[in-house]
A protein has these predicted regions:
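Gram-negative outer-membrane beta-barrel transporters
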Residues: 1-131
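A short, compositionally biased micro-patch
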Residues: 41, 111, 142, 152-154, ...
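Hydrophobic, lipid-facing positions within transmembrane beta-strands of outer-membrane proteins
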Residues: 44-48, 102-106, 143-149, 192-198
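Ser/Thr- (and often Asn-) enriched beta-sheet segments in non-cytosolic proteins
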Residues: 60-62, 143, 158
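C-terminal beta-signal and adjacent terminal beta-strands/loops
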Residues: 71-72, 121-129, 151-204
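Short, local alpha-helical segments
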Residues: 130-133, 142-146
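Hydrophobic alpha-helical bundle architecture
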Residues: 135-137, 150-151
Length: 204
């Protein structure tokens, strides 16, 4: 802010007068012109989680559905004249991160005896980016599908194989991410990905 700016704001608008200390005579004793956090972020949302467990002849099944709805995301900045600049980021995308209204995950796991398997769907809602003033561009929704299966041997050895992003979904192009052309913090940077894991429990 600066001491003079604080004095001007107090005199002209009545703002920031609390930063000015006065003597009993009314003369200025001190102006609190130290580091001040003038920006703040307001976030509001709703998270929903539902789980269900099923015991059947075909095995044990578990289901989980979680969803997140972003209701409010405001970034407020105080300008030198004391006015406030507010940016509503719900449903928008920027150079470092996207803020979709909806995110959701569905997962089911199955096990019977030594066998197990799982399926997961990850949903990211659409957003709008503004690469240049007044130029609005929609970024589509993205859903990833992951599958995996495994087997546990009697000697403590376990094997598991899986595929993440089964449909080889590529991250949507983003014009606000000029260096790599997509949002690496929101979307999977790698396409279809195969993996295998072998573990051995020595306690068995």
């Amino acid at each position: 802010y600066g001491a003079q700016n604080l004095l001007d704001l107090c005199a002209s608008t009545g703002q920031r007068c609390g930063f000015i200390e006065r003597e009993s005579s009314g003369e200025i004793a001190n102006v609190a012109d130290g580091p001040i956090n003038l920006n703040n972020t307001k976030v509001e949302g709703v998270d929903i989680v539902a789980r269900y467990l099923l015991e059947a002849d075909s095995g044990t099944w578990s289901f989980m559905l979680s969803g997140a709805r972003l209701l409010d995301l405001e970034e407020r900045s105080t300008l030198p004249d004391g006015s406030e600049f507010v940016v509503d980021k719900v449903g928008t995308a920027a150079s470092r991160e996207a803020f979709p209204k909806w995110r959701a995950t569905f997962q089911t796991q199955w096990s019977k005896g030594a066998w197990s398997g799982s399926y997961k769907a990850r949903y990211i809602g659409d957003t709008v980016e503004e690469p240049s003033p007044g130029d609005f561009r929609k970024i589509r929704t993205v859903t990833y599908h992951d599958v995996a299966g495994g087997y546990d041997f009697d000697n403590g050895l376990s094997i598991r194989i899986g595929v993440d992003n089964v449909t080889d979904k590529q991250p949507p192009v983003s014009f606000t991410n000029l260096n790599i052309n997509f949002d690496i913090n929101t979307y999977d940077p790698v396409g279809r990905f195969f993996y295998g894991r072998l573990t051995w429990d020595l306690d068995l």
